[in-house]
């Protein structure tokens, strides 16, 4: 990688991390209801850092809802438009050490079964490396390839094939 590419990649990661910050509004305490203890669990993932992402944010936070990363034909290189989402998922993992994610790599139907399984794995590894590069821990990430076995679209057209060239980020609880 030449220096210009590294500089552009570093700038993209910095912008992506800045885009994932969450504004926290100060709310005065209204009623002293039942207290929650630090480290209490919500959905199996410890809620150890108040004011940061919680498991419910996986459904409500727009950058965390982006859980499908698409790829170009026969490529395992990440597109720039997915860098912000990847940085957001990395931040979630940093804030939640008990969280785990699977990178499920997929390919379209073109190519042999073996080739597509390898391509799906390379794509999953590319997303995993990007998440780790943004601060996610390798111990929190698993990669599995389904190759062409789990298409989201069954037509034989470029539009359909482009939907099948993907990595799905699936959160699990250990």
Q: What function would you assign to each model-found segment?
A:
Residues 153-157:
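Short beta-alpha junctions and helix-cap segments that line functional grooves
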Residues 97-106, 121-152, 165-174:
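A non-catalytic structural micro-motif
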């Amino acid at each position: 990688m030449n220096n210009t590419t590294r500089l552009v990649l570093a700038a993209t990661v910095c912008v992506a991390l800045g885009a994932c910050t969450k504004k926290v509004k100060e709310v005065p305490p209204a009623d002293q209801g039942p207290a929650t203890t630090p480290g209490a669990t919500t959905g199996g993932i410890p809620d150890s850092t108040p004011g940061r992402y919680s498991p419910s944010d996986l459904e409500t936070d727009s950058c965390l809802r982006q859980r499908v990363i698409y790829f170009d034909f026969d490529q395992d290189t990440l597109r720039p438009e997915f860098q912000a989402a990847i940085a957001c998922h990395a931040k979630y993992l940093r804030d939640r050490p008990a969280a785990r994610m699977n990178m499920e790599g997929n390919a379209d139907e073109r190519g042999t079964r073996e080739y597509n399984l390898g391509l799906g794995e390379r794509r999953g590894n590319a997303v995993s490396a990007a998440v780790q590069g943004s601060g996610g821990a390798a111990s929190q990430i698993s990669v599995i390839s389904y190759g062409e076995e789990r298409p989201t679209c069954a037509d034989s057209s470029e539009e359909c094939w482009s939907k099948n060239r993907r990595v799905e980020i699936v959160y699990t609880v250990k």
